[in-house]
Structure formats: C-alpha cells, structure tokens
C-alpha cells in the first residue's frame, strides 16, 4: 500500500467543499464509489458535514497556509481489503499524522485498477481552532504503511523514495499523462554521452548534438531543450551538478555565443512514451484534435447560444400573444391585473428554465472540448469504442494485468450480449456492470469484485465464455474457486474447467442436481401405452420386479399402477413448479401428508379416494383407518379465513398495502400524487423519499422513476434513515434486503 499527500500548489484554489464533493461524486458510474463516511462531525449527511467543516475553518482567521489536507491511500492491484480493514487503516493513518481528533470525510474509489481511499482532512482542530501541520509527513507515512502492511497481511511496497522533487514529478507525468518528460528523455537517449564528456567544450558539443543547451542558472546548471523546457542538471544525475562537474572538468566555461549552426542528431519533443503498438496515426489525430479544440468549442457554444436566444424569443412571443388575449377578453380591472401577473410569472419561469438548460449545455461542452493529456484522450476514445486506443492503453508499461481472484477463457469464443461498460481505466481495464457487482476485463482475464453476488459470478463466467472461450481457468483463493464451481452449476453454461479437480467437482454437482430434479419430477406411468419403446416406460428389468419393489419405487406407499393417469395430468405442472423440501429417493411421507397440492395456493380441495387406495399398509397409525372429514390445515400453504392464524398477512405487508391503498385512492381523485406500489427488485436507481408509520409499522418510501415503492422496515432502520437527505440521496437494496445508500452506508 502507498499513502501520499497531495499538496495544493495554489493556496487560493484550496477548497474543502470542492475536494469533498469531488471524492464523494459517483460521476454517473455505478461502481466508482464505495464506502463514504464523515468522522468527528456532528452532521448526519455529507453536505451538512462539509458546512460544519467550513464553519470550523472560518473560526481560525490567523492561519495563512492551506487549511485542507488531501491524503490518498492506494493498494496493490488485486488487493480488496474489507470495509472494516479500510476503516481501521484510515483511522491509524490519521492518528499517526496527528489528525485523530480532526474532522474528515473519506471515500473509497473502485474506478481504477488500484483500490484507493481519498481522505479530506480539516487541519483546524474542532475545539482548539489551531492548525496542525504534520512533521516530516512522508517519513511518518512510510513508517505507518510498513506497520499496516505487516498487521493486515498486505503486499509489501518499497516506501523508501527513489525519486525526489522534480524527478518524481517527471515520473508521475510519464505515468499518468503518457508523455515523455525531458528528464526521462535525457536518461534514455544521451545520459551516457553527457557523462563521457572530458571537457567543457566537448560537453557543450554533446548538448548541441542533442538539441539542448547547458546554461548557468542561479547557483547551478540547467539543461534547456529547444522548446524552452528546462531541467536542473542535478535532477538528471547527482554527478552532473555544478560542483561535481567543476571538480571533474575544472571551472565552468560557457559555450561560445557564436557557433556554426549544426544539425542536431536528435531533439526532445513531448511525444508519447514508446509503446508496444504503433500509435503514429492515433497521435496525429490527437494533435489535430487538440489544435482545433478552441475553434470547435467556440462553434458549439455559438450554436447553443443561438438556440437559447430562439427559445427565449419564442417564449416572449407567446407571452405577448397571451397578454393581448387578456386585454381583449379580460373582465374587470382586478381580474386583468391577476391574469397579467400570472403571465409575467410564467414568462420569468420559462426564461429561467431556458437559461438553466443553457448553463448545463455550456458545462457539458467545456467538459467535452477540454484539453486532455495523451493518456486521457486514449481513455476517452476507448470509451467511445476505439479498439486502437484500447490496445494502446493496454500496451503501456503501467498495464501489468489483473491479479488476485481471476478467471480466463480459452478456445472458441461465442460472442453475445455484453453487459454495460461502467468505466475504462488508463491501463485499458474495462469495468462492466453485472447487477450489484463489477467485472473487470484487461483483455486477457476477468476479475470479479469482492462483494460479488451469485448473479455477478454467473455473469463473469458468461462473459469469459463469450469473449475468450469455453475452457475456463480459475485462479485465486479456495473460497473463490468454490463459488465459481457453484455459479457454473447454477448457470448451466456449456463450459469446462481446465483444472481437473474443479472440473470433476463441477461434474459431480451437476449430476447430483440432475438426479435430484429427476426424483422430483413425477414418473409417466399410465395404464396403457406400455409397449416397447413407448415414452415414459420403465426398463424391462423393472417390469419383472415384485409388487413390493414397485411400491417402494413409487415412494408413496401405493402401487405404481394405482397412480393411473393422475400422474400424467400433473406432470407438466410439477416440471414448471418444483416442489420444495422433497425427501430422498425411497422415502415415503406419512399418509396424513399425502395428496398435497403444493403448486396451488389457498385452495380448499376435497378428494374422493379411489378404489385402489382404500387398502392401507399395516404400518399406518390406527386413527387413519376410519377416515372422516379432515381439516385442511395440513396444506403446506396457509388458507386465509377468519378464525385461523394460518395464511395471515404479515404486519409489515398489511401496513404497506393500507398506505398504498390510501395514496392510490387520493391519486384517483385527482390529487398530484405519484403512483405507489410495493417494493419489487428491478433496474433503475432508487431515491430515498422519507419514512411513514402506519399502525405502528415503519415504512420506507423509495422512488424509482415516477413511481414510489413502499418497503416495510424495522424501527432501528427507520431511526437510522432519518440521517439521509430526502429526495437527494440515492439508495439501493442489498441481497439481504437492507437499505444501502449510494455513499456506501448500509441501513
């Protein structure tokens, strides 16, 4: 793991609210945002916590430095610590830096190849109102990371900084922007030539041959490229500092001002870092787009502005017509005055809506036509379906492939419907949405998120088969392999595991499932049609079995022939509606539990026993011999009727139905009330709309589209939901039925 402080270069741009809003913004991605929490804040929501932090910062008027501390904690690719581990790591790091009592907002991000935590810390103490600045934070963070890796079993990183200052920033630029820095170019192209110079004249000639110039700047030396980019000589190598060179070559000698113009053998340009694929055409397209960016943005803004002006003019024209109509048909001075006021208010509202729409369009245009680095441009092209851009991202040195719990396919691919793409990282990893889970694809293997559901695992198997082939290789923990075997059996996909042990286990479970289904399905045994080769008949060996054996095979204490065509009538229904809790093969239920109709709900059935069913086996209890009218309480599904507790509606469902009926009745009368219904799982985002209490039962209101879903909850959940902002916070329902906010909180 790596913990890094991100300083704000310009003090005037320091803004805790902007930082907190950025780290808690989902950016229209389902799997970008993980757990979000506010620590040492009294507020119940993130926006209120931001206001509380800003108020605390305003109490300190003497501090001149940055009052916000931005910290990033990143983990190795493939590491997925649990939520409790992440919270413990955050707490220990903040305490180690001296910010244990300070207000902070943190968010877990999953939209890159490395799981990471953003922590926005208020440097102003909430009670003392003094500003705290950590002492040697890089050293403290390195020691904390080493201890945390040891305590939580994380993969070890080297926390000794190998690059400092400008050299480290140049390396960051190459990694994140994908553009070659001057420091990196010198090291790769001409560092040996520079170190091999034996005099100042020879050193100046080497500089000219490589399109650079050696100059004195302040108390040191700098290398200046032809485009004006400069770097300190000591940043390139410690033995190229001015004292080191003077000790080796003597006192510094400047280059003669007049030199014959020589053609440089090579020259530094801000070109992309060399990749394993050819990116000449892509980079030419990138440069052309960046050069025409300003013109294209101005043209798009002009079109949007003309469209806004036309809409405003149309609104004013409509308003003038309305006022003219009022002038002609209006009766009475007071009535006309009221109508004129309504017309003016409607015009102002319409113009405000038009201006708001224009502001949104302008923001989107600036975002679309903003200048991007080479790596960001490749990412945008890949998101729009550019296969060459995606291949270039995957060819970068930073792209090292997925690790941890992964699956890969081999063989003949079977293209099919692919799930929606949530994001593409700068390493070329595609993040797919699979229900509540995320599936990552790096072009070679797939990785499933830690909180993957059974549906997510099945979707990963289906995706691997469609994109790579039906021979599946599973790598990871024993638990993950067991989950993939279970998902393969449940999905019934035509795949094969390359690991013989996994494949044998899958075959065993599959055979067990098929055997279990055959025992649940009624056998087709009619009185007629038992000729050779007839459908549903038994093997010849079974036809010569004894009567006792035939009764045992029937499994219900009756001869197989006595079942007659009643088995034929129920064959199709039993195939569609599988009966639950069926015993093992050969086990017969007690007589009082026979003839149940589990596939039918809440139906009173009277059955007249056939002649073949009057004789009972001797092991039947005596109270069954003289059968009279028996109550139907033994039916597996309860019967709703007065005086019995079986089949009663649960209180939560009854309260929800009552509330829905009351709201629907008002809606049908013309009230402006959205449609209400019980909560059902489905696609679409849910927005929290508040809670209600009906007959002592708490209900949660969740809005999906234009419909309000009503869900029964307990009192503890209702109390916790009071901290969620009504109408603003998005929520989701977990597989266990609990409410989870988009910020990661489970209710």
UniProtKB/Swiss-Prot annotation:
Function: The initiation process of transfer DNA synthesis requires the interaction of at least three plasmid-specific components (TraH, TraI, and TraJ) at the transfer origin resulting in the assembly of a specialized nucleoprotein complex - the relaxosome. Site and strand specific cleavage at the transfer origin is dependent on TraI and TraJ.
UniProt entry keywords in alphabetical sequence: Conjugation, Plasmid
Keyword Lipid metabolism: no
Biased segments, Low complexity type: 537-562
NCBIfam families assigned to the protein according to its UniProt record, in alphabetical order: TraI_MobP_relax (NF041893)
Entries under InterPro entries matching the protein: Endonuclease_MobA/VirD2, LPD7, TraI-like_C, TraI/MobA_relaxases, TraI_M
Encoding gene (name): traI
Region (Disordered): 510-594, 624-652
Compositional bias of kind Basic and acidic residues: 513-526
Protein name, as recorded: Protein TraI
């Amino acid at each position: 793991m790596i913990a890094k402080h991100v300083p704000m270069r310009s003090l005037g741009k320091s803004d805790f609210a902007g930082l907190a809003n950025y780290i808690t913004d989902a950016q229209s991605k389902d799997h970008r945002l993980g757990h979000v929490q506010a620590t040492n804040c009294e507020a119940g929501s993130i926006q209120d916590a931001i206001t509380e932090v800003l108020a605390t910062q305003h109490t300190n008027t003497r501090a001149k430095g940055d009052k916000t501390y931005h910290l990033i904690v990143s983990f190795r690719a493939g590491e997925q610590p649990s939520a409790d581990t992440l919270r413990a790591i955050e707490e220990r790091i903040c305490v180690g830096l001296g910010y244990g009592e300070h207000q902070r907002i943190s968010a877990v991000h999953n939209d890159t190849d490395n799981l990471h935590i953003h922590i926005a810390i208020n440097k102003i103490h909430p009670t003392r109102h003094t500003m705290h600045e950590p002492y040697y934070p890089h050293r403290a963070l390195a020691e904390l990371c080493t201890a945390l890796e040891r305590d939580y079993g994380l993969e070890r990183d080297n926390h000794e900084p190998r690059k400092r200052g400008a050299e480290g920033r140049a390396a960051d630029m190459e990694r994140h922007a994908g553009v070659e820095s001057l420091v990196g170019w010198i090291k790769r192209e001409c560092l040996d030539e520079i170190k091999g110079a034996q005099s100042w004249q020879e050193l100046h000639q080497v500089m000219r041959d490589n399109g650079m110039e050696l100059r004195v700047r302040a108390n040191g030396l700098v290398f200046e490229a032809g485009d004006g980019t400069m770097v300190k000589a000591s940043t390139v190598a410690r033995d190229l500092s001015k004292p080191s060179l003077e000790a080796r070559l003597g006192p510094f000698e400047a280059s003669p001002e007049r030199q014959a113009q020589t053609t440089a053998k090579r020259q530094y340009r801000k070109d992309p870092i060399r990749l394993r694929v050819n990116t000449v055409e892509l980079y030419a397209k990138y440069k052309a787009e960046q050069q025409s960016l300003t013109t294209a943005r101005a043209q798009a803004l002009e079109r949007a502005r003309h469209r806004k002006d036309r809409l405003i003019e149309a609104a004013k024209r409509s308003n003038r017509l309305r006022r003219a109509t009022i002038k002609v048909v209006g009766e009475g001075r007071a009535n006309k005055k009221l109508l004129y006021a309504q017309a003016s208010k409607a015009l102002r509202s319409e113009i405000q809506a038009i201006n708001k729409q224009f502001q949104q369009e302008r923001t989107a245009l600036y975002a679309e036509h903003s200048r991007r680095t080479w790596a960001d441009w490749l990412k945008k092209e890949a998101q729009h379906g550019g296969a060459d851009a995606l291949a270039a991202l995957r060819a970068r040195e930073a792209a090292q492939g997925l690790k941890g719990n992964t699956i890969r396919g081999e063989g003949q691919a079977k293209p099919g419907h692919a799930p929606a793409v949530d994001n593409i990282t700068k390493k070329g990893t595609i993040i797919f949405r699979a229900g509540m889970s995320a599936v990552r694809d790096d072009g070679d293997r797939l990785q499933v998120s830690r909180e993957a559901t059974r549906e997510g695992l099945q979707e990963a198997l289906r995706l691997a088969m469609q994109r790579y082939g039906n021979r599946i290789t599973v790598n990871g923990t024993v638990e993950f392999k067991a989950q993939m075997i279970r998902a393969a059996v449940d999905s019934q996909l035509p795949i094969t595991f390359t690991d013989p042990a996994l494949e044998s286990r899958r075959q065993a479970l599959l055979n067990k499932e098929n055997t279990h289904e055959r025992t649940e399905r009624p056998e087709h045994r009619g009185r007629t049609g038992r000729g050779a080769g007839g459908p549903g008949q038994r093997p010849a060996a079974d036809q010569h079995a004894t009567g006792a054996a035939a009764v045992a095979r029937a499994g219900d204490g009756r001869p197989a022939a006595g079942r007659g065509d009643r088995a034929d009538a129920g064959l199709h229904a039993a195939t569609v509606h599988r009966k639950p809790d069926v015993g093992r093969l050969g086990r017969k239920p007690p007589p009082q539990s026979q003839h149940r109709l589990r596939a039918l709900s809440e139906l009173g059935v009277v059955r007249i026993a056939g002649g073949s069913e009057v004789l009972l086996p001797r092991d039947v209890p005596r109270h069954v011999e003289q059968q009279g009218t028996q109550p139907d309480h033994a039916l597996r599904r309860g019967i709703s009727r007065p005086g019995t507790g079986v089949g009663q509606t649960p209180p939560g469902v009854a309260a929800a139905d009552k509330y829905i009926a009351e709201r629907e009745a008002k809606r049908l009368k013309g009230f402006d009330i959205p449609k209400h219904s019980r909560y059902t799982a489905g696609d679409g985002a849910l927005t929290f709309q508040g809670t209600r209490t009906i007959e002592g039962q708490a209900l949660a209101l969740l809005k999906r589209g234009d419909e309000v879903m009503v869900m029964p909850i307990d009192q503890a959940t209702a109390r916790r939901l009071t901290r969620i902002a009504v109408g603003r916070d998005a929520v989701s329902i977990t597989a266990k039925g609990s409410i989870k906010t988009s910020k990661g909180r489970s209710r």
